[in-house]
Amino acid sequence: MIVERVSVVGSVAGPLSDIFAQFLPPIGWATVLRRTFHEMNDDDCWGLAAQLAFYFLLALFPTVLVLVALIGYLPLDNVFNELLAAVATVAPPEVVILIRTQFDQVGTGNRVGFLTVGILGAIWSSSAATSALIDALNTAYDIKDWRAWWKRRLLAIVLTFGLAIAVVLSLALMLIGPKALTWSVAWLGLDPFVAALWQMARWPAVIVVVILVLDLMFYLAPNRHVKWVWISPGALMSTILWIGSSLAFRYYVANMSDYAAAYGAIGGAIVTMLWFYVGGLAILVGAEMNAVIEDAAREQLRADPTGQ
């Protein structure tokens, strides 16, 4: 990755300048965005996002199997419907219909069998998706992964479990949290204002979880030591792009396109893969941005070790 060397942004005066400077890129934000776009073309992020979309779609069905089996053990009513309602706020209608169809097809079967098969299938397919994401992040940083295949696969499985924990936490924030607060208001005399405040705060809390997950992914996945301070801009950018592009894509599919007429029975799968493509591309944009910022920071440090 070749970048021009520019001095630290930095005309922040006063004693707080050193504190603020470490959170600013060593090049201007306009330059960061321009170079990020160029790096995306050089690294063929458009093709890498298509690979990620394929693996994400491959992991969808076993993941739904696990959800179907686990939801049956939860002492809550209409959990799956509430989950779909939450997904529908950002996902296109065809994605929700596809998940609902899979749920209806397997929801009446052997719960234990689905849980066993689903977990095994989810581990394999989801770790394959995570492994593809690791390769994509290494490409973004222009580095070759010399680690043994079993080490990469083990890392992918560990990261997959971490993502699963984050998903469970997000679901708890969206679904179980409000019910727990309602129970607390009714039985413990908790101030209703707290419950109302949580209703407003739970989505920002989920967004924070997503940003933290991306931070960890950008920090652990590449075969390179990445300075923590330079991965947060990309994680924030990926989250913003994913939410914004998902909402835009959802509006387009719902109001301006008819994939069912164009693709027939596979229209839902096509829309789902396109949605995953948008999400994968958003992650790669953040990774490329981090790579641009860190490369500039390393080069500046080599040019001026004193940081003056």
Regions of interest found by a model, annotated:
Residues M1-Q308:
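Membrane-embedded alpha-helices and immediately adjacent juxtamembrane helical segments
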